[in-house]
C-alpha cells in the first residue's frame, strides 16, 4: 500500500440526489440497460500514460505535477503500478490501458528495455491476481523517443523499422501475458513534415507490411484479442497517414487487412480531422471496423488535442447511440484517454476527473438507450429509405443505365423532394437527453 490517495474513500453509486463529490450519481455498474449491466456496456478503462506518467508539461512550460514515482528505476515503476491499482480499486475501474514506456523505465539498449518491461509486467500481473481490474489493451510508444522523430514503421532508416518491430513484438507478448482484450497501434510519427523529403509510396508499403507482420504474429502466439488502429490527422506529425476512419479503411483494404483489424476511435482525434465523434463511430460501424473508443474532449477554442475529460452528456449520448446501433462493444470499451489540467495538482483531482467522466458517460448511455429502446428515431430513418424496399428499387441496383433510362421514360418518372425532417428529429433527440 502507498499513501498517495490517503483519505479518499472508495467511490460508490449514490444516485442523482447525492451531493457527495466522491460518489457516482449516474454510474451504477449493476444497473440493467437493454438487458446488459451498465458496466458491461461501458467497459471503462483508465489510461496509464495520462494518469500516472504525464508530468503536466505543455509546449510553453515544463513539469507541474510532482509524483513520488517519477524516475527511471524499476522500484519507482513498481510504486507507480501500486498507486495505479489503488486508484483502480477506489474507482471500481474494470480495465486499464498502457504503453510500454508508461510502465517501465527506458533502458540503455533494446535488450535492457525489454528486461525492464518483462519485470514490470510480472509485477502488474501479480497485482492483477488480487484485483478485479483487467487489461483492455496494450500498445507500444513509438513516438516519444528521438529515434522515432521520422516515424517507426515508415522511417527512412531500416534500423528504426527493426527496432519498432521488435518493440511491438515485446508489447504484444506483454499484452497477451496480462490477458489483454486488444492490442492498439497509433501512428503519431507515421506521417510527414514536408513532401520535399518524403516518398509516400515507399512509406505506405512499409506501414502495410509492418501491420501484416503484426497480424501474423497475433496468430503465431495465439493472441485472441483484436488488433486496433487509432486514427488521428495530425499532431505530432504535420500530416499523419491514419488521418481518419475513411483513410484507415482504405489503407486496410489496400493491404488486405480489412477483416483483421478494427479501429479505436477517439473523440478528440475526430474533431481534429474536422468530423464529429458520432460521424467517425457511425462510419466505422457501417464499414464493420468499429472496435473501441478513446473518450475525451477537445477545447473547441484551441486548435490542438487537449485531451480533457468529457463533461457534455448530450454530446456523448450521440456517440453512445452509434455504439448501441452497432451492437455494443465486444472486446473494446471506453478508455479515458484524458488528463487532468496542469494546474490540477492534488490526488483528489485525478479521482474526481474520472468520477465526472464516468458519470457523464453513464448519463449519456442511459439517454441513448432510452431513445434506442423507444425506436422513434430508427422508425423515422427506415421510413426515409422505405422506397428502396420496393421490388423495383431493388432490381434497379442490378440493372444498367440504359435500362433505368428506359424505365424513367416509360413511366414518366418525375420525383418530388421530401422533407428530411431534421428539426423534428432534433426535437425528438432533445426529449431524451
Curated annotation (Swiss-Prot):
- The stretch of residues making up the signal peptide is none
Q: Which GO terms describe its cellular component?
A: cytoplasm
Q: Which cofactor does it need?
A: Mg(2+)
Positions annotated as active site in the UniProt record: 99, 102
Q: Which InterPro entries does the protein's record reference?
A: Xyl_isomerase-like_sf (IPR036237), Xylose_isom_bac (IPR013452), Xylose_isomerase (IPR001998)
Q: Which reaction does it catalyse?
A: alpha-D-xylose = alpha-D-xylulofuranose
Query: Which locations, inside or outside the cell, does it occupy?
Result: Cytoplasm
| EC main group | isomerase
State whether keyword Isomerase applies. Answer: yes
EC number per UniProt: 5.3.1.5
Manner of cofactor binding, per the entry note? Binds 2 magnesium ions per subunit.
GO MF entry, a single one = magnesium ion binding
The subunit structure is: Homotetramer.
- Name the UniProt record assigns to this protein: Xylose isomerase
Protein source organism: Cereibacter sphaeroides (strain ATCC 17025 / ATH 2.4.3) (Rhodobacter sphaeroides)
